[in-house]
Regions:
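Active-site/binding-pocket entry motifs
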Residues: 48, 77, 244, 284-286
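Extracytoplasmic/lumenal domain signature
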Residues: 63-77, 107-129, 158-190, 223-259, ...
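Repeat-blade elements of multi-bladed beta-propeller folds
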Residues: 42-46, 84-106, 131-158, 191-216, ...
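Short, polar loop/linker segments at the starts of domains and inter-domain junctions
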Residues: 52-64, 83-87, 251-255
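C-terminal segment of N-terminal export signals and the immediately downstream linker at the start
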Residues: 3, 24-47
Length: 357
């Protein structure tokens, strides 16, 4: 583009500027036929379940990128100063539709070719919902056969929407809404819980992370769960703070596991659907700057965890920081990559940390 765009100023004005070329080459004047087999869509938070964040499309390249023009702009219109709002979502595109979350955690569905608003969903219109300003990084798109659903986390709730109409899928949870503070295997009274990154779609399940904060306030642990994508029934749970008798429980001295929180998956998860493996990165145990009341290595805080996506069984883990008191939580979802090791190519997991890769 000839002119620079100040993203912060745009977002303050309540505008989500979607440069259409990023999502579909068919909506810019430079378009030409894509390479055979090339994916035209961005259906997951990280483009694909393995979080490559890479598109193989070749229509836009070094020779023509300077000629791009804005195809359309969508204004969300719900930014505010009180409460202060921000927008952190990565819009996804599936079946020619762009889905995004807004400053007030609404969901907007747009025609990818024109930017026309197809439908919107406001969580505050659902019973017992209060104002929903907050952070969300993306929605989750799930499809099996002719069924297509959008899963939208809003703080401690998850909404299940028909991807075509934006209406609540009433058979899921309680009228299309799932309370994420339930079925958590601990007393959640007075504990904070928040899901800011999208869940992961796998077979007929939705895999969910999240958790409580890492500060001094009482917070929930970051247990990882699987829910039936149609009914909302819990399928399995993995305790990121192990319960007595579980692997890693000996890394928490005494009863510290009972009162500690954090060890959350706030940055998102990745999936190898072919192998059926789920990869999660976790944050610090709470309180993240004091560990005197939680002596030990504190598994599975500050860890990359590989789970059987069908059962929740731990396959392996790697803890990047033992007994964290420096807030060295893992700030990104794991990325599944191909790497060369000892002369051969292997499947590997790359994890960004606050101290390097």
């Amino acid at each position: 583009m000839a002119q620079s765009i100040n993203r912060r100023n745009i977002l303050k004005q309540g505008t989500a500027s979607l440069i259409a070329a990023r999502f579909s080459s068919s909506i810019v004047s430079l378009a030409r036929p894509a390479a055979k087999g090339a994916s035209r869509e961005w259906q997951c938070y990280g483009n694909d379940p393995g979080a490559s964040r890479y598109s193989p499309l070749k229509q836009i390249n070094r020779s023509n990128v300077s000629k791009l023009k804005v195809a359309w702009v969508h204004r969300t219109g719900d930014a505010s100063q009180r409460p202060a709002t921000t927008i952190e979502c990565t819009p996804i595109m599936a079946d020619g539709v762009v889905y995004l979350s807004t400053c007030q955690l609404q969901v907007h569905a747009l025609d990818a070719a024109t930017g026309k608003l197809l439908w919107s969903f406001d969580p505050t219109t659902v019973r017992r919902r209060r104002g929903a300003a907050g952070v969300n990084r993306a929605v989750c798109y799930w499809r099996q056969g002719n069924e297509r659903r959008i899963f939208m986390p809003v703080k401690d709730m998850m909404f299940c929407l028909d991807a075509t109409t934006g209406k609540l899928a009433l058979g899921f949870g309680d009228g299309g809404v799932l309370d994420l503070k339930e079925n958590f295997d601990c007393d959640m009274t007075g504990l904070s819980f928040n899901l800011t990154s999208p869940p992961v779609a796998y077979k007929d399940m939705i895999l969910v992370g999240g958790g409580g904060g890492e500060g001094p306030e009482p917070a929930a642990p970051g247990h990882i769960r699987a829910f039936d994508a149609r009914t909302g029934k819990r399928r399995w749970i993995f305790h990121t703070i192990p319960h007595p008798g579980e692997f890693g429980s000996d890394t928490w001295e005494g009863d510290s596991w009972k009162h500690a929180g954090g060890t959350n998956n706030w940055a998102g998860m990745s999936l190898d659907a072919e192998k059926g493996w789920l990869f999660a990165s976790t944050g610090s145990p709470s309180f993240d700057f004091y560990g005197g009341n939680r002596k030990g290595a504190n598994l599975f805080g500050n860890s990359v965890i590989a789970l059987n996506a069908d059962t929740g069984e731990r396959l392996w883990h790697f803890q990047t920081t033992h007994h964290d008191v420096l807030d060295y939580d893992l700030p990104a979802q794991p990325a599944l990559v191909k790497a060369r090791h000892n002369g051969r190519q292997i499947d590997a997991v790359a994890q960004v940390t606050k101290t390097g890769l």
